[in-house]
């Protein structure tokens, strides 16, 4: 294990770091694009797995283009909403990454924990409330905030 003695601030991602939820989202993308055929599903799955930290707001328009589906703002939002309905409860129910829950509870007073995720902000906050994590993190950043900008803002705010 890495020594934490020299750190005050720790950034956390969510999927695959706090909860074992990467496969939940992979399966949801495949389910969402299943009507478009196996070739599109395979392309979507491979892209998602290679670009895990990319927001669904960036992925879904790309996947719609691959599927040959008209992608106006309303259609993109429709697919994003469907995706959210598929994943939210499954993410909450997914297994914790081993040791993370205990670590977060044990060290929430010692460190500044900041959650930075590509999951939409309101959905991420709902998930964190359901998991009793809102008191663990000093700040929770979700999409449309980029991870890079969220980290930069935090480092400025905490003068790191």
Each language-model region and where it sits:
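An amphipathic alpha-helix signature
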Residues: 26, 30, 53-61, 80, ...
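Active-site neighborhood of HAD-like aspartate-dependent phosphohydrolases
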Residues: 1-46
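Helix-loop "lid/cap" segments that line or gate small-molecule binding pockets
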Residues: 32-34, 55-71, 154
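Short beta->alpha linker loops
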Residues: 24, 55, 95, 99, ...
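Substrate-recognition "cap/lid" segment bordering the active-site pocket of phosphatases
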Residues: 114, 120-160
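Metal-dependent phosphoesterase signature
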Residues: 64-101, 111
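N-terminal polybasic phosphate/anion-binding patch
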Residues: 41-54, 61, 65
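Short, acidic loop-to-helix structural element flanking the phosphoryl-transfer center
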Residues: 6, 88-115, 125, 149-152
């Amino acid at each position: 294990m890495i020594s934490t003695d020299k750190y005050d601030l720790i950034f956390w991602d969510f999927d695959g770091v706090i909860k074992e939820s990467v496969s939940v989202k992979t399966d949801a993308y495949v389910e969402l694009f299943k009507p478009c055929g196996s070739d599109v599903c395979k392309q979507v799955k491979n892209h998602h797995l290679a670009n895990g930290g990319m927001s669904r707001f960036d992925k879904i328009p790309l996947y719609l283009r691959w599927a040959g589906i008209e992608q106006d703002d309303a259609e993109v939002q429709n697919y994003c909403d469907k995706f959210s309905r598929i994943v939210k409860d499954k993410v909450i129910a997914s297994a914790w990454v081993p040791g993370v829950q205990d670590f977060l509870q044990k060290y929430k007073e010692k460190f500044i924990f900041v959650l930075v995720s590509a999951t939409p902000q309101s959905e991420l906050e709902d998930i964190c409330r359901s998991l009793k994590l809102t008191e663990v993190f000093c700040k929770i950043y979700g999409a449309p905030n980029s991870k890079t900008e969220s980290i930069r803002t935090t480092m400025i705010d905490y003068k790191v």
